[in-house]
Amino acid sequence: MFRFLFWCALVVGIVIGVLRATAIRWWRVPSDDPYLTASVSPSIRPGDLILLWRLTKPAFGDLVLCPEPKRPERIVIGRLVGEGRDEMEVNGGEIVVNGRRQNIESSCPIKTFSEHDPETHIEVEQRCNIEDINGGHFRGEIPPSSVRPSDVKTTVPEGDVWLVSDNRLYPYDSRDFGPVPRETCKELIFFRLVGAGGFFDTKTRNQYIP
């Protein structure tokens, strides 16, 4: 019996090791970068332990983790919404790709959430909606009383991708650092193992991230 358990544990360990080396890695969302953490809410939050998939090329609508183009030591996270030669428009919270506007499906189950302004550190309440991209994902809306980010209209260069933050009030995305070389965006965020509250926080444990 002991030998059987030993071999089972060994096989499981080898499988996990192979996956860890080739297909999957885990990463914890930092809590010391207010611009990054504000830009990714409400999809992921500071302290989340998330899984990254590395074997398939990220597609339209995927949430990806990439090095910032001009500062590769810095990590950026965004929704892949444009590729080479796509005509991009970002108007406040709205995204238009090649003339097609990405629509809102419904409100999120959480309805509203709070996020800290990365500059003033004041807590701001935002509405959460589900955006119809890649099956639907959470999107933080811009309150009517807030100053909305700058609009942009551009063509994505060949070989690059365009990233947009899920939090439309506090974005840190391609409007700030420009298009990102596709070859550097190889990791897709797809699962949350645990949240900042740890294993016993069942509300944030073992969740698929669209």
Where are these regions (language model features)?
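Soluble "head" domains of membrane/secretory-pathway proteins
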Residues: F2-C8, G13, G17, A23-P210
